[in-house]
Amino acid sequence: MTPFIFTISATFLCLSALAAEPVRVFLFAGQSNMEGADTDPKLVETFPPFHNALRPLENVRYSYQTGADHKSKGWTNLRVVGNNFGPEITFARAFRQQSKHPLALIKDAWGGTTLVNDWAPNGGDEKSRKLYQRFITQVRDRLADLKKQGLTYKIEALMWHQGENDMFHPIGKQHYEKNLRNFIAKIREDLSTPELKIFVGEISTKGIWGMDNRANVTLIRNAQMAVVESDPKVFFVPTSHLSFKIGRP
C-alpha cells in the first residue's frame, strides 16, 4: 500500500506542471487500503526508503474521517493518526520533494465498504454507511474553512483505492464499471470540478482475498480499466507488482 502512493505522486507531477496556486488540495477516499488497515508505523520506519517518513509535517494541512467516528476537528497538521496511516503520508513527502506550494489533504476511508452501497452517491439502501455524503460534506466544510482564512485553493485530484468488497457483492461486482463512472461524474459535479483528475489504485491479487478470488479481482480490475481507457482524466495505478507488506513479498 505505501509504495503505491509514490507511483501516484510521480505520475501526477509528470502530468501537471507546478502551478502557483495558494493551496493545492488533494482528496483521498476508499476502503481499507486507503484507511491504512494493518499498518505498522514502527516496522515501516525500519525500512530504509521510509526512514523518517512518518514524522509529522507541520506545513501540510490535513483533514480526515476514518472508520465510524475517527475524525479530525477541522484542519490539523499531517501526521500518523493512532497506529494507522494510508498513502497520504508518503504522498505528501513526495510532493514536498518537488514543490513548496501550500498543500492540503482531505481523506475519508472505511474498511470493508462497497461502492455499490456505502459509497453510492444516491445514498444506497438502509444498511449503507452513506460515505459519499459524508465525504462531500467534509470536503465542502474544509474548503469553506480555507475561504474564511482568506485563502484560495484548487482541488487537484482524487486518489481512489477501493473495490475489494464489491468483489463479494452479486450486484456490485457486475456493475462496478457503471458505478465507478457514476461516482466520478457525481463527485465532479458536486465539487464543481469537471476536469478533476482521478487516480484509481489497482486492487491486488496478493493477500488471502486476492489469491482466493482471482476471477472476481479480474472482474473489478477490468471494470477499473474500462473507465480509465474511456476518460483521459482518469488514471490507473498498478499495485500488484508491489510488496503486500513491508518485509514480505
Locations of regions flagged by a protein language model:
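Bacterial N-terminal signal peptides
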Residues: 5-16
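N-terminal secretory signal peptides that target proteins for export/translocation
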Residues: 1-2
